[in-house]
Each structure stands twice: as structure tokens, then as C-alpha cells.
Amino acid sequence: MRNTFILTLLLLLNIANISANIKNLNNNWKFFYGDIPEAKYVDFDDSEWKDIRIPHDWAFENGYSANASQKDKGGYLGGGIGWYRKEIYLTEKDLSDDFIFIDFEASYMNNQVWINGNFAGERPYGYIPFSFDIKKYLVEGRNIISVRVDNSMEPSARWYHGCGIYGNVSLRSHKNAFFEKDGIFITTPSKDKVCVNAKVISAEKSANYLAKLEIFDKAGKCKAQSETLEFSTNNNLSLIHISEPTRRSYIS
């Protein structure tokens, strides 16, 4: 059996500061097992809550039970509802970026997020990463992140799952323009052509950018490159032709 080996693709754009500023938020969270709707508010007193670090799994933390709501399919662990809160401090410089997102790598399940008492969004079910644009809710100085995670409808899976925020949490900011998170898609219409679909998010409603596509092999040698391409925030990038595509054989 023979498969075409797809070479590494590099996109070089002339957008200033296109790289993200990322701040890890895993440390110094407060956690409460139970449902307290008032926990979304800034002035809520969480001083008696448990100090935890992300990643966190309250089902495993609470232990096993023959009567646990996940039953045998979930390893005899429980479910329920949990609340998380975190305090962060931001400077005027931190808030100067055009876009500020909060990124959750994984949280199970049915997540709701508030920033300073403002509802930022929700992510039904679990397993996949999710993000919310929270710049408009942030202030200089003290900010409160509140997260409600609902595992009250158990069993909810055919195997053990964690309960809570079990993946990294981070604050991600961009100036002016950036590639949408997980927004670059590469397809091969034929063995010698690569099609790139790259979505750019811009602070300007309509903007044009220049891009150059280069493809490198495993040794770092440039195998193909495009001319400088002009595209807008609403258009895709173009095809690039590879005159001598590298192939790799697989035996199965």
C-alpha cells in the first residue's frame, strides 16, 4: 500500500504581532462541590472553598462508591455540580491587546463561564476545547473568573470520565489580527497540490494582508513556495504546486 507523504507547511504573514500572548491560569483556583448560583458574582465570599490547582477531577477526589451515580460504566464514581473561581489581576498594558480570550483545554461537562459576574458563554457536554472572547468584561486590576460545571445527569458516558476542569486553562491575547485558533486547514486535491484554508480574525472589519506559503521537507529543505499572495479576512489562501512530491511507502 502506498500513501503520499504530506510535507510540513509554513505560513509567513506580514501581520505585526500575529503571535499570541498566553498566560497560564492553572494555579490558585477555589473549588466548591455543590451548586451555589451566587458564586458567579464578584463580591461572593469563597474564602471557605477548597484551594485547588487545574487540572482537577472531583469525581476521583471524592472516591468510589457502590452507589455512585456513574455506576459501573463510570468506574463507580460520582457526578454532581461543582463551582470554580479564580482571581486574576490585569494591568493597563494587559488590556491593550485587541482580543483577549479565555481558553479551556478540557472540562467535563456542561460548562458555564462568568467574568466579573457577566455571562461569557457555555459549552455543552465535554471532551473538546472551548474559548470565549472576554475582553469587554475585563477591568484594570482585580477580575473574577467563575465556572459552573454540571455533571448532575449521570451516567453520561459509556466509560469513566472526569468531573471538572481537567485540562489547562489560559488567557490568550492578540493585537490587530491573528489566525483563528485551530483555523488552518490543509487538503491535497492531488498528490502535487496543497490547498490551504486559513481564517484570519482582524480588529478591522475589512482588511487585506500579504502571505507567502512555503513547504519544507523533513531535512528542512524548501520543496515549494508560492508567490506573495494578497488575501482579505474573508478569503482563503491559494493552491501551491509541488513539482516533486516526496512519497513514503507503508506496508500493511
PLM region spans:
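Accessory beta-strand-rich segments of carbohydrate-active enzymes
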Residues: 23-27, 32-35, 74, 79-181, ...
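Surface beta-strand/loop "capping" patches
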Residues: 176-204
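Single conserved hydrophobic/aromatic residue that forms the stacking wall/gate
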Residues: 240-252
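Beta-strand-rich binding/interaction modules
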Residues: 193-231, 238
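Predominantly extracellular/luminal regions of secreted and cell-surface proteins
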Residues: 30-60
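Sec-dependent N-terminal signal peptides
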Residues: 4-14
